């Protein structure tokens, strides 16, 4: 047996391949990071976006192993994200909130600085699917995705409709494969 500790993503019990030989990690262990200055300062803040993400992951047979709430400030977002990326039990991170076009919406910028590789197709597909629901207003979202320290990270708007759309239609169908791809070099 190796002296190297086994982390959840490298555990052979959680790694498999699909019919096409694609690496998969399942069940997934996700972290949810809600970005909202108003909610972060409230004593009993509700978190509909985070609750929606957690519910959808659990309904799909996955686990949410961490939930965090942070103000829409670059340094605060990056500190909490860094903690989540350092947590060996976290396979992927989904953030909600702070993706709009106002000066206060800094999630894509703060998280994007942590990306080793961007996943531009995520934002492109999200905006395409959003267009079908909300029309041209989709241009105001800066939803994005990428790989940070071998961990897929998705940056979603705060709207529960947007969270549901992105999680059901894009993230859940692809996350097990993305986690497998992002961590394959750790087990080869």
Predicted regions and their residues:
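Proline/glycine-rich low-complexity loops and linkers
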Residues: 102, 106-188
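Short coil/turn connectors at secondary-structure junctions
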Residues: 27-28, 88-90, 148-151
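Haloarchaeal acidic low-complexity proteome signature biased toward cell-envelope/secretome components but also
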Residues: 1-31, 64, 182-188
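Glycine-rich phosphate/diphosphate-binding loop of Rossmann-like nucleotide-binding domains
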Residues: 18-72, 76
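A generic local structural motif
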Residues: 17-19, 78-81, 139-142
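Short beta-strand segments
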Residues: 33-34, 95-96, 155-157
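Generic recognition of short, well-ordered alpha-helical segments
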Residues: 44-48, 79, 106, 165-166
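N-terminal small/polar loop signature for handling phosphorylated ligands or for N-terminal nucleophile
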Residues: 58, 64-115
């Amino acid at each position: 047996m190796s002296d190297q500790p086994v982390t959840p993503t490298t555990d052979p019990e959680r790694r498999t391949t699909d019919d096409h030989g694609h690496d998969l990690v399942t069940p997934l262990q996700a972290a949810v990071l809600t970005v909202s200055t108003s909610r972060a300062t409230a004593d009993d803040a509700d978190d509909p976006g985070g609750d929606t993400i957690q519910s959808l992951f659990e309904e799909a047979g996955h686990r949410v192993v961490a939930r965090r709430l942070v103000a829409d400030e670059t340094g605060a977002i990056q500190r909490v994200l860094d903690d989540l990326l350092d947590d060996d039990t976290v396979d992927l991170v989904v953030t909600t909130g702070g993706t709009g076009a106002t000066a206060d919406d800094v999630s894509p910028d703060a998280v994007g600085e942590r990306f080793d590789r961007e996943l531009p197709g995520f934002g492109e597909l999200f905006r395409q699917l959003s267009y079908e629901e909300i029309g041209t207003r989709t241009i105001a979202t800066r939803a994005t995705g990428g790989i940070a320290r071998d961990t897929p990270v998705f940056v979603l708007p705060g709207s529960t409709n947007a969270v549901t759309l992105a999680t059901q239609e894009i993230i859940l169908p692809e996350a097990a494969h993305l986690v497998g791809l992002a961590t394959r070099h750790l087990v080869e």
